[in-house]
Amino acid sequence: GLGDVYKRQEESGVEKGIVYVITEHTTTGITVNESLPCVEKDLMECLDRIAPEDYPYHHNHYLPTYGTIGGNAPGHLKSLLTGNHCVFPVLDGTLKLGHAVDIYFCEYDGIKNRRYMVYVVGERG
């Protein structure tokens, strides 16, 4: 999960508001789900069935603007399916997530140096 989301909210001093988490990349996702290895595995297997690596995607050709072959179409599609952001309420100075809820940063294009942004907006105590 994204443990520093809690830290950022606490440091903000916001008592009532929202926390907004968004990725900066088009082949990553931000999603919310139960924090269990079996759920993570099921999610990835489902996404692999929907957007398999070996499909002949239109994106897998030379892209002059990038000077390379776009071989990451499955990553773009998986990102669309999981989404690129999530929003949670802050009440009484506490980030409100369900009992078994965790926030996931999902990488769909190999190991890379990636970033996401956390915005905390609201009324301070």
Q: Predicted segment positions?
A:
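Divalent-metal (often Zn2+) His-rich catalytic cores of metallo-beta-lactamase-fold enzymes
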Residues: 33-35
